[in-house]
C-alpha cells in the first residue's frame, strides 16, 4: 500500500488517480466505400453518414479528500449527421479545473475554472452556425447544518464570445443561493434562487443569443425553484416541483408539476 509507504514519492503517487473513457460510433455508405474498415480510428469523410465521438479524461489529486483536492477534467464530443435537408456538425471541448477545500466541519470551499469551446455547423441553416468560446470562474461556499442539511452560496463570472457571423459577445454574472433539507429517507426539500446579469452584444432574437444566454434575456434575470419530496410508503413517493423565472422584458413565468412514483 503506497499510501502507508515510508517513501515520500510513493505517498505522493498514492494521491494520484485517473479515469479515461472513449467511445466512437459511425455509419458509412458502402456504395461509396465498399471496404470494411477494421480500424475504428480511421474515418473516411466521403462515405461518412453519421458520426458520434466522445472522449473524457479525469485526473484526480487527493480524490475524495475534502481537506483539499484537485480535479482536472478534459471532455471532447463531436458529431456529424446527414439529413434530407443537409448535413450538420457540432463539437464541444471542455477543460475544467476544480479545487475543493474543507475549511472546517461547517464550511466547504469549491472553486471551478472552466474553458469551453462549442461549435455548430449546418449546411442549409446559416443562422445556426456558431463558434463559441466560454471562459468562466465559479467559486462556491457550502455551509453544513447537521448531517443532511446544507446551504450553498455561489458566484459565477462568464465571458462568452462567438467568432463567426455577427460576432456576438456576452458578459454574464450569476449570484445564487440554494438550500437542501433532508430528513433521512422520509422527506426532502430543495430550494434555489439565482440572479443573472447579462451584458449581451448582438441580436437578442437569434439562435446564437439563446445558446449563449441559456434561454435567458438581456439585462437582469431571476430564476427560482422549489422541490419537495415525500415518501408516502415503502413503495410510493410523491414529488412537488415549482419553477419560476422573470426578466425585465418578459412577464413572470410559473411552471409546476406533481409526480407520483411507484416502486415495484
Where do the language-model regions lie?
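Exposed, low-structure sequence patches enriched in small/polar residues
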Residues: 1-264
Amino acid at each position: 500500500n503506497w499510501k502507508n509507504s515510508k517513501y515520500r514519492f510513493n505517498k505522493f503517487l498514492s494521491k494520484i488517480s485517473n479515469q479515461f473513457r472513449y467511445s466512437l460510433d459511425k455509419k458509412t455508405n458502402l456504395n461509396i466505400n465498399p471496404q470494411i474498415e477494421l480500424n475504428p480510428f480511421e474515418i473516411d469523410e466521403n462515405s461518412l453518414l453519421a458520426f458520434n465521438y466522445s472522449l473524457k479524461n479525469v485526473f484526480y489529486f487527493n480524490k475524495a479528500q475534502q481537506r483539499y483536492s484537485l480535479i482536472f477534467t478534459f471532455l471532447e464530443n463531436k458529431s456529424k449527421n446527414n439529413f434530407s435537408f443537409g448535413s450538420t456538425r457540432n463539437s464541444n471541448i471542455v477543460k475544467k479545473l476544480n479545487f475543493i477545500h474543507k475549511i472546517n466541519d461547517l464550511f466547504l470551499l469549491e472553486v471551478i475554472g472552466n474553458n469551453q469551446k462549442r461549435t455548430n455547423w449546418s449546411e442549409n441553416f446559416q443562422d445556426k452556425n456558431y463558434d463559441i468560446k466560454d471562459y468562466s470562474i465559479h467559486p462556491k461556499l457550502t455551509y453544513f447544518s447537521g448531517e443532511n442539511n446544507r446551504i450553498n452560496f455561489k458566484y459565477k463570472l462568464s465571458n462568452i464570445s462567438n467568432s463567426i457571423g455577427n460576432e456576438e459577445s456576452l458578459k454574464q454574472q450569476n449570484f445564487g443561493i440554494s438550500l437542501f433539507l433532508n430528513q433521512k429517507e422520509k422527506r426532502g426539500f430543495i430550494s434555489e434562487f439565482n440572479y443573472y446579469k447579462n451584458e449581451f452584444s448582438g441580436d437578442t432574437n437569434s439562435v446564437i443569443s439563446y445558446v449563449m444566454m441559456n434561454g435567458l434575456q438581456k439585462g437582469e434575470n431571476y430564476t427560482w425553484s422549489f422541490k419537495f419530496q415525500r415518501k408516502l410508503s415503502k413503495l410510493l413517493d410523491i414529488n412537488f416541483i415549482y419553477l419560476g423565472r422573470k426578466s425585465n422584458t418578459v412577464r413572470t413565468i410559473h411552471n409546476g408539476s406533481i409526480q407520483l412514483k411507484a416502486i415495484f
